[in-house]
């Protein structure tokens, strides 16, 4: 479908590229962001990519809605480039599965008629696309989880989920960047800080990155935890065809 542009209040617009969660749609959104950034337009306050749309906040004293639409329409309708040599960023997230770190691993396994080892193997066998950021600072909305481990949310959310907890809700998976309430099924925990305001880029991940969960043991967890912000996760740069899980 052709992108549709619509106003959001008096100083923002939404560009909708589709109505389904799809990596190609999300790639088009990211390419649109890059194209707009290359213009260095004064008055663009912020661009927020979502699953299927791009929200652009702008200075209403600089542009009218109609003026901005005239600038953006040619960019939004240009064909998406299909560079097969493009390298994608894959960030390894070391994770302890099960036990006190993943109290719901057993339920996820039994719900799907699998062993706990099966769940760990399936969950860590896919590279997950970061579609967008939201909910709380540093939280990533990931796509690509294998439906074989899909599990409903908890019927009663917990009042406290520790930072770094890795969870499953429906066909989604993700990592809690900070302590918070939550209703996801917790299957593990990472010692890596997903959000740290002392870093130049506070959030470890950004839209367009891929996450690769790597199983570790409890000893490795505590070693990495002690390193704190000095620990640097392993980062791979791979072609699309080399992603795990084929997503």
Where are these regions (language model features)?
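Glycine-rich active-site loops that engage anionic ligands at enzyme catalytic sites
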Residues: 1-247
């Amino acid at each position: 479908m052709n992108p549709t542009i619509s106003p959001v209040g008096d100083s923002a617009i939404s560009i909708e590229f589709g109505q389904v969660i799809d990596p190609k749609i999300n790639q088009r959104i990211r390419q649109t962001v890059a194209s707009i950034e290359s213009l260095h337009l004064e008055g663009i306050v912020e661009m927020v990519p979502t699953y299927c749309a791009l929200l652009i906040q702008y200075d209403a004293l600089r542009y009218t809605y109609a003026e901005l639409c005239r600038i953006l329409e040619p960019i939004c309708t240009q064909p998406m480039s299909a560079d097969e040599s493009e390298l994608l960023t894959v960030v390894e997230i070391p994770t302890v599965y099960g036990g006190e770190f993943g109290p719901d691993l057993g339920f996820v396994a039994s719900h799907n008629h699998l062993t706990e080892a099966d769940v760990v193997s399936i969950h860590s066998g896919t590279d997950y696309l970061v579609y967008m950021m939201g909910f709380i600072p540093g939280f990533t909305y990931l796509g690509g989880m294998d439906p074989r481990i899909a599990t409903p949310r908890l019927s009663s959310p917990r009042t406290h989920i520790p930072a770094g907890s890795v969870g499953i809700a429906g066909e989604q998976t993700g990592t809690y960047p900070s302590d918070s309430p939550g209703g996801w099924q917790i299957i593990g925990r990472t010692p890596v800080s997903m959000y740290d305001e002392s870093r130049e880029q506070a959030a470890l991940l950004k839209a367009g990155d891929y996450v690769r969960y790597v199983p570790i043991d409890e000893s490795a967890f505590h070693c990495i935890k002690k390193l704190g912000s000095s620990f640097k996760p392993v980062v791979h740069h791979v072609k699309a065809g080399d992603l795990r899980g084929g997503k």
